[in-house]
Amino acid sequence: MQIIHRVAVMQVLTERSKEKLLASFAEKKQMLERECSQLYFQLRKHEKEQQNPNMIEQFKKAIEKRKDDIKIIDFQIAQVHTLPLGSELKEKEVDALLTIEAGDDWHEKTAANTIVIKDGKVIEIRQR
């Protein structure tokens, strides 16, 4: 019988992967800043027209949420700069098919497995 099992994918930090990660964070930050600008513009427009105060409050909350997300990204960028090369970062989790037979040790079979990648190539599969 086959079951679906979650497997962690860890990425070894290299100079190239560090650059990609930082570029990804910078892109997300830039997108959030553009959204903030657009929301701020919409907020000013609604304030001038003296429309629904609830709508104005929603715009303010949306802007604050994006500013908080920008602070989180800034923190993540700082963390990446402090990590030494060779560190392992959890990239994601994937589903894997696991074959189970009668008589198998359940705990051994379903113990957490980890796939380690470096620059897009699998370098190790760890079984605990």
Swiss-Prot record:
Pfam families with a match to the protein in the record: YlqD
InterPro entries (alphabetical): YlqD (IPR021297)
Highest taxon of the lineage: Bacteria
The protein's name: Uncharacterized protein YlqD
Organism encoding this protein: Bacillus subtilis (strain 168)
Lineage: Bacteria, Bacillati, Bacillota, Bacilli, Bacillales
